[in-house]
Amino acid sequence: DNRDGAIREDDGTLYVAAEGHEVAYKIENLCDRRYGVGADGLMLLDSAPDGFDFKMTYFNSDGSGGMMCGNGGRCIVAFAADQGINHFDFIAADGFHTAEIVSQEGRTKIVRLRMKDVSGMDRYDALTGVSCASEGCFMDTGTRHYVRFVDDLDQYDIVSEGREIRYDATE
């Protein structure tokens, strides 16, 4: 039974999902990789304003507020279903989202999530002051992403290149 809280993994990213704000102050300890569950973040399933089924509140593993995350959004929908919620129009930090569970086998659910439309691609990130290399850009899907264009994806070392981009302060 997942009614008291859940640890959800989606695409290699680990999240803790829980109801209400009673656990918010413990986020950093819960997510700690050595002494906690080692999660990438914590999401709270909260009551929402009229017109929505629930509110997703996302926190980064250090306890700071986070933005919408697609993997996390699918996980919170699966958790909401475990709580008896069967309609998935929800609000998150970036606005409205809708989802559906397209299949389920045992406790495994396949969730289709509608993300916000990307409004544009920028070569400069005003929030961080970072300029992109000519082969990439920033876009916002609820959370800022860096996208790099490549000619032959099969020959591209995604893991190494992704690690380099993520931890390079100039990109």
Identify what each model region corresponds to.
Residues 107-115:
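Short, solvent-exposed secondary-structure boundary/capping segments
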Residues 57, 113, 137:
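Beta-strand scaffold of nucleotide-dependent catalytic cores
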Residues 128-130, 134-155:
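Internal active-site segments that recognize and position negatively charged phosphoryl groups
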Residues 102, 114-118:
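Solvent-exposed residues in well-ordered beta-strands and their adjoining turns
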Residues 1-108, 147-171:
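A glycine-rich beta-to-alpha transition motif near the start of alpha/beta enzyme domains, typified by
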Residues 119-123:
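Short, charged/polar, Gly/Pro-enriched secondary-structure boundary elements
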Residues 61, 118, 143-144:
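Short glycine-rich anion-binding loops that position phosphate/pyrophosphate groups of nucleotides
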